Amino acid sequence: MKKLIALLLALTMALALVACGTTNDPATTPAPTTETPAPTSNEEPTGGDETAAVMTYAEYEAAAIDAAVTVECYVQATQSWWEDKITVYAQDADGAYFIYELKCSEEDAAKLTAGTKIRVSGFKGEWSGEVEIMDATFEFVEGADTFVAEPLDVTDLLGTEDLIKHQNKKVSFKELTIKKIEYKNGEPGDDIYVTVAKGEGEYSFCVERYLTDPVTDVYKAFADLKEGDVVNMEGFLYWYEGVNTHITAVTPAA
């Protein structure tokens, strides 16, 4: 019996030694590699300076429709702000811009006063003859001067091919005869469509309610005008299938 017990003890010790000898040492186990391969030379870089060069008016005018454009210009007037967008009439010393639904916070909209200089980046578009900047963002040009354009008298250009060269500028007309006044939807509160005559030509102008709403003097003035009245007008030389000035002032012709 004693020999059997001694034999069993010896066998147990031998098995324990074998188990210890085959245990893996964690300190010597190689860790998996986490190194990221370096990019090859044909991979395209990301990021970078995306600031576009500011165009002159001549460069903007020459740009193709749908081209990306960046301009610096001065606010002359705005339409009503709505849902983080605002439409801007702008100008510089060389030309004018209609910036349609510019992306803008309500706080910044309040700062877009006449004369304020802004840098605008968007795309050049065209709709029914009106050339505009669309899908645009902007920033204020800090420390810039201010500029408010004087209306350019384009009376003598009515009916000529030269009139469109001044598209979107602040303009004036002298001694126009009222031919018809029509309220959109048939009653005051919306746009006013005004047909005027000069010489043998007739032209369609508009009191745009989002620019000059029903509480403004120019809007109210049309309640007292009638066919045959002779007036002077100021406005922005908008285009819609021909001249369609957005009227900002009207007074009796002297």
Language-model segments: which ranges?
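Sec-dependent bacterial lipoprotein signal peptides
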Residues: 1-18
